Amino acid sequence: MWLEILLTSVLGFAIYWFISRDKEETLPLEDGWWGPGTRSAAREDDSIRPFKVETSDEEIHDLHQRIDKFRFTPPLEDSCFHYGFNSNYLKKVISYWRNEFDWKKQVEILNRYPHFKTKIEGLDIHFIHVKPPQLPAGHTPKPLLMVHGWPGSFYEFYKIIPLLTDPKNHGLSDEHVFEVICPSIPGYGFSEASSKKGFNSVATARIFYKLMLRLGFQEFYIQGGDWGSLICTNMAQLVPSHVKGLHLNMALVLSNFSTLTLLLGQRFGRFLGLTERDVELLYPVKEKVFYSLMRESGYMHIQCTKPDTVGSALNDSPVGLAAYILEKFSTWTNTEFRYLEDGGLERKFSLDDLLTNVMLYWTTGTIISSQRFYKENLGQGWMTQKHERMKVYVPTGFSAFPFELLHTPEKWVRFKYPKLISYSYMVRGGHFAAFEEPELLAQDIRKFLSVLERQ
């Protein structure tokens, strides 16, 4: 009898696993209200309003006064960026910021693209919307939503946008011409922050889906890295029939399967689906994964637990804010940059570009609300939310940049995204792909579209 029960149980489990293993689940498309107070009975204003970035002499004067009060602490000898942002190099950065950086000029650059705001679920959502200046005969532009992460902003996409919207004038084929929409995550930059607890990536994905509908797009493509990769993933889980293609340059795919391959991959990598390049980027696993993630994730523990505490200090000090943000643009671009006195920052970025991104946090006072996004998404622990355990069933492309904080092998990506149709090992670049290597990322997005359209 017990043998029959055991065999029946095993058979039942096998049938359940076989039936459910490829079940294309979707997240429920709910509704929300994140503005202050209770939701009004009146219909929400769905108008789309032009917006312009502005500044003032008073704003700049206040910034300069605060910079002038910076209190310098000498770094330890030969510490480079191992202890965080090297304060000797910080002096150079703030001297440039105080005496040479032209915020009014950068505001003009920000306003080169059309900005808009619209109210969704009680929040004023900011976005830029860039249409192609010209189209080949018989072509229509492909709508592409691009989503930033932390501590970035919509400004990360300024150099890649013309490569996507006007490829012919930038030495590229006009086979794929895009209409690009770059929103600011609520609580970042010019998008209003939630007044209520619980505003996470799924809520953001739903709002951005509503934004695309409001702009008249029933079907569209989406692209993201960092938080943008999770938000875009959630969009594909919420409304897969509306997402024609998903392109990522980062993927949160840690699972029992990836853990197993990490533990056994150095010896049995080929049998576990790892390539020689995967093994090169992941091993020795103690240094390249475990020690590296421990060393670079301290900020995450703070922001997942008590974001308002550190945020209050950063929101009061522009120099502290710059050090906190720019240290990520050093190490996340290449972890080896921590061995350099200047963190390698100007090897990949200009100080004007870096400080413009910092100013988008400083002038809007959004560092605290941006950090709260960590607590809302990760504060309850890993793999505690439904979407983390769900697969994604839309055509997917992936760019694996070699200096991303954690390399993600194709086998891992395919486990989460079974319809992966394009996976590229990029020749250089790190976490801030669109900001650092716009040409490479644009080429891979176009490659993904070519593969998708051939199918």
From Swiss-Prot:
Mechanisms controlling activity: Inhibited by 10-hydroxystearamide and methoxy-arachidonyl fluorophosphate.
InterPro entries: AB_hydrolase_1 (IPR000073), AB_hydrolase_fold (IPR029058), Epox_hydrolase-like (IPR000639), Epoxide_hydrolase (IPR016292)
Active site: D226 (nucleophile), Y374 (proton donor), H431 (proton acceptor)
Organs and tissues of expression: Found in liver.
Cellular compartments per GO CC: endoplasmic reticulum membrane
Result when mutating H139R: In allele EPHX1*4; benign; frequent in the human population; 62% of wild type enzyme activity
Segments passing through the bilayer: 1-21
Gene Ontology molecular function terms on file: cis-stilbene-oxide hydrolase activity; epoxide hydrolase activity; oxysterol binding
Catalytic activity, EC: 3.3.2.9
Keywords carried by this UniProt record: Aromatic hydrocarbons catabolism, Detoxification, Endoplasmic reticulum, Hydrolase, Lipid metabolism, Membrane, Methylation, Microsome, Transmembrane, Transmembrane helix
Dimethylated arginine sites (modified residues): R295
Places the protein is found: Microsome membrane; Endoplasmic reticulum membrane
Ranges of the Cytoplasmic topological domain: 22-455
Catalysed reactions, semicolon-separated: cis-stilbene oxide + H2O = (1R,2R)-hydrobenzoin; 1-(4-methoxyphenyl)-N-methyl-N-[(3-methyloxetan-3-yl)methyl]methanamine + H2O = 2-{[(4-methoxybenzyl)(methyl)amino]methyl}-2-methylpropane-1,3-diol; 8,9-epoxy-(5Z,11Z,14Z)-eicosatrienoate + H2O = 8,9-dihydroxy-(5Z,11Z,14Z)-eicosatrienoate; 11,12-epoxy-(5Z,8Z,14Z)-eicosatrienoate + H2O = 11,12-dihydroxy-(5Z,8Z,14Z)-eicosatrienoate
GO biological process: arachidonate metabolic process; epoxide metabolic process; hydrocarbon catabolic process; response to toxic substance; xenobiotic metabolic process
Keyword Transferase: no
Topology within the bilayer: Single-pass type III membrane protein
Recorded consequence of changing T396I: Either a rare variant or a sequencing error
Pfam families cross-referenced by the UniProt entry: Abhydrolase_1 (PF00561)
Similarity section: Belongs to the peptidase S33 family.
Pathological condition linked to this protein in its record: In some populations, the high activity haplotype tyr113/his139 is overrepresented among women suffering from pregnancy-induced hypertension (pre-eclampsia) when compared with healthy controls.
Function recorded in the entry: Biotransformation enzyme that catalyzes the hydrolysis of arene and aliphatic epoxides to less reactive and more water soluble dihydrodiols by the trans addition of water. Plays a role in the metabolism of endogenous lipids such as epoxide-containing fatty acids. Metabolizes the abundant endocannabinoid 2-arachidonoylglycerol (2-AG) to free arachidonic acid (AA) and glycerol. Binds 20(S)-hydroxycholesterol (20(S)-OHC).
Name of the protein in question: Epoxide hydrolase 1
Organism, scientific name: Homo sapiens
Gene: EPHX1
